[in-house]
Amino acid sequence: IFREKSDKRRGITRLRLVHSESIILSDILPVLDNLGLVVIDQYPTTIHVSGRPEAVISTYRIRGTKQMQVDLMNRRNRLSSAIRASILGVFDNDSFNRLLLRADVPWNYVSLIQALHSYGRQLGSPYGRETVREALESNSDVVRSLTEYFRIKFDPSIEGLDTSNVCDKRLQ
């Protein structure tokens, strides 16, 4: 994920994917759309090196939707990890994925939120997926605080932190 000089004033960021075969647009566009991104165009380049398998580099010019103006360069590590996980099939591709950029949380926490919503539906929650997603997106600061609280509370590598003050500043 990078930006060229001419891209900054237009709010455009470039995403480059390197793979052994061409990614079909119908496969990648829903992934990017569910992350809240708009794809402006795509430039594929095929690389031929003798004695090696062919590689394809696809460069996409992207930006956030009008409703979600975020600096993609500041979130490029999170974004690239989520795209990779989605392409590999370990990150569900649905509209909850917008929380990754909106709330600035990692993809595995978005997966946790997806699972908690599904569990709630099994228990009889009357709220549909889009209703819950819209509520969470509208309160992205709360989502970020709750996922931060969850990490501090349950991550075994974090010891001795007091969770009582984690959300206080953001929730006031």
Regions found by a protein language model. Give the residues of each.
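Non-catalytic interaction/regulatory segments
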Residues: I1-L37, D41-Q172
